[in-house]
Amino acid sequence: MDRRTLLISLASPAVLPSHSAVAGSAAELRQISYPVFGGQEDSFRHYCIEVLKLAVEHCGVGYQLKPVLQPVGQGRAIRQLSAGEGPLNILWSMTSAERERDLLPLRFPLDRGLMGWRLLLVRKAEQQRFAQIRSLEALRALTAVQMHDWPDTQILRANGLQVGTGSSYENLFAMLQHGRTDYFPRSVLEIAEDMARYGASHDLAIAPGLLLSYPTAFYFFVSPREPALAKDLSLGLERILSNGSWRALFLQQMRRQSKALKLHERQVLALRNPLLPAATPLQRTELWEEPGRLGA
């Protein structure tokens, strides 16, 4: 994935007209302030920004996009958004019942479900060890690593897997490198860039043959104090679903990478997700992707 093709400059706000003509100056436009999380600037993040941009262009209302330039951890950003404090009024994250209770979810899975398809980063010297693993029972003898405030931590533990946690994204790779944990589950949307950034320096590899899978969704979440913003963006998202521009953008991100990861050749270990809200629109098949189709 080429992040340069999707990058929106973080140096200044982007003023986006709606799909219909918007009168007035930028000063009259409503503002959408989104976070820049430290240490995780990747092309999936920029893809999410591009989806947000498309939704604004098609919602029929004028908005100004403004990045919050200081690093803000995910847990802190969610607390600020829920309380109506701080500069944010939107963020994107994996869903959970707790997050849908505290925030306004836009139930439009930005990841098309693929955030729950996880490959394993391991130490390069231990690839053969993981090549012998064919069951969850065998995997339970080892320890995964995740951020302390990621929903994935609870999901993995609910399936009987051991999880060590860290409070710094970069430190997770160091924990794996130095043997404090055994593997780092990363989504198929993230793992190629993780390898490009940390693989050589931390002596890591992608474990052969395995793929963990659990149902989940990665949404935009809006401040509960801004229901009008949630309504406007939901309309824009439905329009880019209908006109095909959203899936085209998604495939631009994923198709080449999916083929390289050989997803269709991997053994799938299915996990349950006790955090998945009942309102998740699993019945809307047009919102979801099957990884095996991406390399076609």
Q: Language-model segments: which ranges?
A:
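N-terminal export signals
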Residues: 5-23
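Extracytoplasmic small-molecule ligand-binding "clamshell" domains
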Residues: 25-100, 233
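Periplasmic-binding protein-like
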Residues: 36, 114-119, 196-234, 256-278
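A ligand-binding cleft/hinge motif common to bilobed small-molecule-binding domains
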Residues: 82, 90-102, 183-203
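Acidic, polar ligand-binding/catalytic clefts
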Residues: 70-138
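Bilobed "Venus flytrap"/periplasmic-binding protein-like clamshell domains
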Residues: 41-55, 120-160, 172, 189
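Extended ligand-binding regions for polar small-molecule ligands
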Residues: 53-58, 124-127, 215-257
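An extracytoplasmic/periplasmic, membrane-proximal ligand-sensing/linker region
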Residues: 236-296
